[in-house]
Amino acid sequence: MIQTESRLEVADNTGAKSVQCIKVLGGSHRRYASVGDIIKVTIKEAAPRGRVKKGEVYSAVVVRTAKGIRRADGSLVKFDGNAAVLLNAKLEPIGTRIFGPVTRELRNEKFMKIVSLAPEVL
């Protein structure tokens, strides 16, 4: 469950280390985002020679949440922290590598590029 002001780690190689959610997209008063949802983020911490700089605003897709995702069979998939992957204006990933596992739910949300780059799909 990601909401405005939530901090997330970045699961790609764009150079950003930490981002902060500034808006949950999808409705005028939408409060929470889960895995597969698109949010607006600002870069809070970045590597010195990365592709992105601190303070820049990007779209991102949530790939892991500590709250977890409930599957149709009743199982619950949780992670240690919250993570996102940065997207460009066409909603394609900016980075060329994804770190850590991602969930199968991203496949339904039309993020096949992220699923194919990920080292593990849960």
From Swiss-Prot:
GO terms for molecular function: large ribosomal subunit rRNA binding; structural constituent of ribosome. It holds the Pfam family Ribosomal_L14. InterPro entries: Ribosomal_uL14 (IPR000218), Ribosomal_uL14_bac-type (IPR005745), Ribosomal_uL14_CS (IPR019972), Ribosomal_uL14_sf (IPR036853). The keyword Ribonucleoprotein applies. GO terms for biological process: translation. CDD domains: Ribosomal_uL14. HAMAP family: Ribosomal_uL14. PANTHER family: 50S/60S RIBOSOMAL PROTEIN L14/L23, LARGE RIBOSOMAL SUBUNIT PROTEIN UL14M. Part of the 50S ribosomal subunit. Forms a cluster with proteins L3 and L19. In the 70S ribosome, L14 and L19 interact and together make contacts with the 16S rRNA in bridges B5 and B8. This is Large ribosomal subunit protein uL14. It comes from Delftia acidovorans (strain DSM 14801 / SPH-1).
